[in-house]
Amino acid sequence: MTHQTHAYHMVNPSPWPLTGALSALLMTSGLIMWFHFNSVALLTLGLTTNMLTMYQWWRDVIRESTFQGHHTPNVQKGLRYGMILFIISEVLFFTGFFWAFYHSSLAPTPELGGCWPPTGIHPLNPLEVPLLNTSVLLASGVSITWAHHSLMEGNRNHMLQALFITIALGVYFTLLQASEYYEAPFTISDGVYGSTFFVATGFHGLHVIIGSTFLIVCFFRQLKFHFTSSHHFGFEAAAWYWHFVDVVWLFLYVSIYWWGS
């Protein structure tokens, strides 16, 4: 490798953007095939290609940052800006769902019975499973902060314990949400209430699964001593993402479960 006189990471040629684009094409085409012809072969191929691409691409990023030293302070600064912009884009994504919910609920049409929840809809009790879910996510926010502070203080064992607790709470939240969906007295096809409820809470649930996966990767990386108190952006990004998921849930709980019921 030639000597470089700047602090920026000039990435090497990589096949993963190409395989990632191909997997996206296979997944979207596979979804159409599944919807119209009830065949999951193409979708399965797309998902497999996507998983392999993500694994190998992020493996390369870890190699470049942890073992090759390409992630200098300037590069980390750029990654931080990138993560902040990504979270802002996610905030706008969820803003659309809240807009749809409030647009429908603040001025219910005659077709809905002129009331909210619409006539015939029996909403979930906000003081049962949704309240438990809220406390679970708030507790996970505390434990991820404990993990971050432990890492900053160089206390590896406490960091691993706190991270494991956070992951366990994330998995517990997902199971509670799945049971709530299974027992819900309405479906996604029950008018605007069902569609806004399931799309907003469903996308939040997907983000919890993504965040839990992010934290599991951080847990295994910490087992291999990848993070130090001064070099741990991978974990920091996961913590930021988890706090974002927390805050979105609080808005969902207050808007859709509590006020909307």
UniProtKB/Swiss-Prot annotation:
Residues 1-15, 67-72, 153-155, 224-232 are mitochondrial matrix. Keywords: Membrane, Mitochondrion, Mitochondrion inner membrane, Translocase, Transmembrane, Transmembrane helix. InterPro entries: Cyt_c/ubiquinol_Oxase_su3, Cyt_c_oxase_su3_dom, Cyt_c_oxidase-like_su3, Cyt_c_oxidase_su3-like_sf, Cyt_c_oxidase_su3_a-hlx. GO terms for biological process: mitochondrial electron transport, cytochrome c to oxygen; respiratory chain complex IV assembly. It catalyses: 4 Fe(II)-[cytochrome c] + O2 + 8 H(+)(in) = 4 Fe(III)-[cytochrome c] + 2 H2O + 4 H(+)(out). PROSITE patterns: COX3. It comes from the Eukaryota. One of its GO terms (molecular function) is cytochrome-c oxidase activity. It is a multi-pass membrane protein. This is Cytochrome c oxidase subunit 3.
